[in-house]
Amino acid sequence: MNLITLENFLDNSSFLILLLTMLIYWAGAAFPGMSILPTLGTAGVAIANLSIATLLGSRWLEGGYFPLSNLYESLFFLAWGVTAVHLIAEKMSRSTLVGVVTTPVAMGITAFAALSLPADMQTSAPLVPALKSNWLMMHVSVMMLSYATLMVGAVLAIAFLIVTRGQDVELRGSSVGTGSYRNKLGRIQLSQAEKTPDGSVVAMADGNGSVGTAVLDRVDPQTLVTDLPNLSPQRLNLADTLDNISYRIIGLGFPLLTIGIIAGAVWANEAWGSYWSWDPKETWALITWLVFAAYLHARITRGWQGRKPAILAASGFIVVWVCYLGVNLLGKGLHSYGWFF
């Protein structure tokens, strides 16, 4: 089996594995009693990650350079990054909902690369002179890892909004599963909690397979309301987990994005004599940086938690895709891949 045949097998296999894994995670969410499904899902993501890594390694051997020279290779590197960050996020959160929302992203990326791109864009070709630099690996790989990390963090924020049904629930805990839960007006729902003799409220929840206790602030009985959309203790526990993990993952992706932009500026100065030329890709990279900088600023200095930062992070998901793919497919600028829908 030659390298080209191996690559064709691996790209289609990666797509099929991720498709099956996505269905397994969805089935696990629909039937939580089937404890084998989360294990199968995690194994599927790990196998897909290994398959994509083997594909990229094969491309490296075939072309003799780090496989990030065209859209096909960068898409699979992005999918590899998403699956790698997924495994980290799932281990941190111990929640199968991570796979429910991340596997569709990884599967969609591999489907686009393997099934939609023209054949001539999937073949390995010699590097153009401008890309024959050690900065190719430093700049592009770090940027792609930052995109993957920020996408996972953003999609977890979207999952938070879905779990909370868009309610302005304030999560005031710094550790996973131990926060206090309040809506915007500082009220909680009677159906969510059990009042203790001292006036505090205890909510028992089994959000991720184990029973935990969240102790809420002491409240006046007059503030207990039942007219708000019902959110169970399980949903609140899960929302707290998603909010916390999304914050941590974005906190990891933002420094990677910063390093990638700086490395790109240094490379641009070496290649073209200018650190910044307001190329469309550079402009959108700056916009992406500003969006997630605003998110982290709101979380760290303003103390935002819950719906408002989640909306900001969710908008960042779209911005990352525009920066990575939308600008490239316009066929303009130094970062264009020259292919149109």
Curated annotation (Swiss-Prot):
Keywords: Cytochrome c-type biogenesis, Membrane, Thylakoid, Transmembrane, Transmembrane helix. GO terms for molecular function: heme binding. PANTHER family: CYTOCHROME B_B6 PROTEIN-RELATED (PTHR30071:SF1), HEME EXPORTER PROTEIN C (PTHR30071). The chain crosses the membrane at residues 16-36, 37-57, 68-88, 97-117, 142-162, 249-269, 276-296, 310-330. GO terms for biological process: cytochrome complex assembly. InterPro entries: Cyt_c_assembly, Cyt_c_biogenesis_CcsA, Cyt_c_biogenesis_CcsA/CcmC. It is a multi-pass membrane protein. Its main location: membrane. It comes from Rippkaea orientalis (strain PCC 8801 / RF-1). This is Cytochrome c biogenesis protein CcsA.
